[in-house]
Amino acid sequence: MTTGQFTIPLMKRFGYKASFAGGVEATASMGGQIMPPVMGAVAFIMSETIDVPYLEICKAAAIPAILYFITAFMMVHLEAGRAGLVGIPKDECPNPWAAMRLRWYLILPLAILVYLLFAGYTPLFSGMVGLALTVVLIFFGATLSRNFGTRPLQIIFWILIGLAASTFFQYGIQAIIGLALLMAVVLWFAKGGRETLKVALNALADGARHALPVGVIIGVLTLTGTATLFAGYIIDVGKNSIFLSLVLTMLVCLVLGMGIPTIPNYIITSSLAAPALLELGVPLIISHMFVFYFGIMADLTPPVALAAFAAAPIAKESGMKIGLQAMRIAIAGFIIPYMAVYSPALMLQGGTWWDTSYIVFKALIAIALWGGAAIGFWLVPMHWFERLWAFVAAAFLVAALPATDEIGLGLTLALEVWHWLRARRLNPATTA
């Protein structure tokens, strides 16, 4: 909702369809939860649940997240080519460094949060420190800094604010809780402060409401034995075909994600399906990342598609159309978890750097092929059989079966030669 207010109208202004602009925004926004170094809240819960350092979670998520955003970029680029859109002149592009020079201090909470996470502190402690510093900057920093008329004094002030916040490290969580109580007292007597406290209490109430169905669902599934039955069913199916077990797990994540937020979805599915996948030989982090990914993809998947329907009023388009576009744009989010199960090197779980490089190479080619097949454009508009050709070639590259890589690469090379020759006949300038 925050970034969409800016990005969706901007894309529509440059000629993108409203449904496509909404789909891009929904896809990119959900991608923030899987992109290190600061991922979604589920990543912190995962770190605590499986007792794995947050750094390892980030390492496992890095390559898939990059591939996810490459897919989104590829779709936007190909759609621009299909629709004949052009970019704005370079002199009209905004300067991000000017904004950084003006408000550089606002990245202090993020920088400290990342430092603490990679320094080995727990996600809970790191998040609390980052949140405390954010509150200090919002409620005190902006007001006090205006009293300093020169830029050097302002810079010194912000450095002192950061150093003051860092002193909380040696006192632990008690100091942060004390600071929160102190600020609550200050806000109670400050002008407009009681409204702020009301917002904070409403946020806590929302968190409790989101947590309530988790306990109910897990309790019902555990007490009735359904959880054990479901896990056993996944294992039984996996003995004959692990692919079917993965599909079943994916469907459960998507269905649960249609009714509950991502965090409760992960907590439930990680307690049901992840242990079953682990018993079938899927590495620990990958089994949890699998349910994590599809819990996020549920917000892009119709008929519910919460992220798509959130973008609908901004784009002034049907949420269902935006959801269908988002599924097409985020195709990597649906495919990469399967590739990681069959090739753990994609998430840096075993294997050599050559193994990782090779699987990334295959994934990039598959992403490009699926992008062309979905949009219907490469160098020039693609015929229906070329789109089918690209889809089949990508499917062979993703499939973990004997000789599928060779077949997929052969089909890809043949398609590229064919399409290049056709594009050269239609528009020599395109291939010059």
Predicted regions and their residues:
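Hydrophobic transmembrane alpha-helices that form the pore/transport pathway of multi-pass ion
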Residues: 1-32, 38, 42, 51, ...
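Alpha-helical transmembrane segments of multi-pass membrane proteins
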Residues: 14-30, 57-60, 66, 242-256, ...
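Alpha-helical transmembrane segments of multipass membrane proteins
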Residues: 30, 41, 45-49, 110-115, ...
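Long, contiguous bundles of hydrophobic transmembrane helices that form the permeation core
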Residues: 59-206, 306-395, 423-432
